[in-house]
Design a protein with these regions (language model features):
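Glycine-rich portal/gate segments that line the openings of hydrophobic small-molecule binding cavities
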Residues: 28-29, 38-87, 159
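Hydrophobic pocket/interface hotspot
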Residues: 16-21, 27, 72, 82-84, ...
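Hydrophobic/aromatic beta-strand elements that line small-molecule binding cavities or substrate pockets
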Residues: 6-8, 67-74, 86-87, 95-102
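A conserved amphipathic terminal alpha-helix motif
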Residues: 114-162
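Beta-strand/loop substructures that line and gate deep hydrophobic ligand-binding cavities in soluble
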Residues: 83-131
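Hydrophobic residues positioned within well-ordered beta-strands of beta-sheet architectures
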Residues: 4-6, 55-56, 68, 82, ...
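Hydrophobic ligand-binding cavity/cleft-lining segments
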Residues: 1-49
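Short strand-connecting beta-turns/loops that link adjacent beta-strands
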Residues: 13, 77-78, 103-107
Length: 162
């Protein structure tokens, strides 16, 4: 088992980041360009503990990579933490903890911790995960910058096409 950890300080208040963390549209936006999950495309409801789903993970939005399963273990409003258990393809276990915490007025720290078990492929999968999550954190900063110029109650309109 390998653990990948990455954190970023975002120029947004905790409530805003926590709201976005719970939306499947945020996940799709953060991963856009690397992969997509067609099963989530029309989903607008926030994540809820106990949910479980399986769908194709599409590399570069075109190539079916493998069927990925996610189970949402917890969505904790008090600690601003989401925990999932995921697996699929070569990945036996991908335990993901997403967390946000206030660090000052209009600023918060967002972190991802991923515990990965992919058997003999664990080191390679962990290396890939580190790259994916660095990309996702860059996209978080971009999303926050875009959101700073918009005030929209429409969740779909909150996510730009690129």
């Amino acid at each position: 088992v390998k653990t990948v950890y990455i954190e970023s300080e975002l120029a947004a208040d905790l409530d805003r980041v926590w709201h976005f963390m719970q939306l499947p549209a945020t996940f799709l936006y953060l991963c856009r360009g690397l992969f997509g999950v067609p099963a989530l495309r029309r989903r607008s409801e926030p994540l809820q503990a106990g949910e479980r789903g399986t769908g194709w993970l599409m590399a570069f939005h075109a190539l079916p990579a493998y069927r990925h399963t996610i189970e949402v273990l917890s969505v904790d409003d008090a600690t601003h933490t989401i925990r999932t258990h995921e697996y699929g393809g070569r990945i036996r276990s991908w335990n993901h903890t997403l967390r946000a915490e206030a660090v000052g007025p209009g600023r918060c720290r967002y972190s991802d911790t991923i515990e990965i078990d992919a058997g003999w492929f664990t080191d390679l999968v962990a290396l890939g995960a580190a790259g994916i999550f660095r990309y996702r954190h860059r996209r978080w900063h971009k999303l926050i910058r875009i959101q700073a110029t918009r005030q929209t109650p429409n969740t779909r309109a909150a996510f730009p096409p690129r």
